[in-house]
Structures are given as structure tokens and as C-alpha cells.
């Protein structure tokens, strides 16, 4: 009976330590996902900017691939919710003829997302981009 409080205290301490370790790992994973989303958005900007300057189709498809990286990272971020908007934009980017007419808008939105992929106003601009791309589809 006298050992029961000591055992409970030890188990509580152990559980607290495990919780803290798991929480640190989750924070690190979140930071890694944000970094991946940022780099995907930045690479999308670079590729589409190069395509706009030089007209190389390889840059166009590289931009689509970079957007896919951004999309997958955002899908794993808890604050992003559904990735339906990213899927819709990605689907429109797969048809480069329609997307080429809106390269300046795509670049502008992705520059915002490259700064902070969790920013609500940048996310709103992504919704507007989706609507713009779907109008021309």
C-alpha cells in the first residue's frame, strides 16, 4: 500500500516524458511540412517565371510537378483542411494551354504561398486562382 503512490508517481512522470517527446516530434514534423510546402511553392514560381521568360515547355511541366509537391505537403498540414482547391488547380495546370494565359496570376499566388503556405489570405487567393482557371476551361 505504501508503494502504490510511488508507483503511480513514477508512471505519471514516465507518461509525461513520453507525451513531451511525442509533442516535440509533431512540432518538428509540422515545421518540415511547412518548409516542404514553401519550397514547392517557390519552385513553382521559379519554373513558371522561367517558362514566361523563355517559353520552354520543360519549365511548364516542372512547375506542374513543383505544384504537386506543394499540394501534397499542404494536404498533410492540419490547418489547411481539405486540399480540394489544390486538386482543382493542379487539374487545371495539367492543361498547359489554358494555364499559360494566366501565368502572371499563378506566379503571384505562388509567391504569396512561398512566403507562408498557412496564411489565410494567400489561401483565399488560391481559391480565386482556381475560379479563374476554371472559367477558361
Language model feature labels by segment:
Residues 5-6, 26, 41:
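Sequence-pattern detector for short linear motifs
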Amino acid at each position: 500500500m505504501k508503494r502504490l503512490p510511488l508507483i503511480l508517481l513514477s508512471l505519471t512522470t514516465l507518461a509525461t516524458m513520453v507525451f513531451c517527446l511525442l509533442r516535440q516530434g509533431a512540432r518538428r514534423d509540422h515545421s518540415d511540412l511547412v518548409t516542404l510546402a514553401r519550397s514547392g511553392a517557390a519552385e513553382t514560381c521559379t519554373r513558371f517565371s522561367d517558362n514566361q521568360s523563355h517559353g520552354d515547355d520543360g519549365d511548364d511541366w516542372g512547375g506542374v510537378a513543383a505544384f504537386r509537391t506543394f499540394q501534397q505537403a499542404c494536404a498533410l498540414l492540419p490547418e489547411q483542411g481539405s486540399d480540394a482547391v489544390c486538386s482543382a488547380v493542379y487539374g487545371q495546370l495539367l492543361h498547359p494551354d489554358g494555364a499559360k494565359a494566366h501565368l502572371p496570376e499563378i506566379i503571384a499566388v505562388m509567391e504569396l504561398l512561398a512566403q507562408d503556405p498557412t496564411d489565410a489570405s494567400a489561401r483565399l487567393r488560391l481559391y480565386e486562382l482556381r475560379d479563374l482557371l476554371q472559367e477558361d476551361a
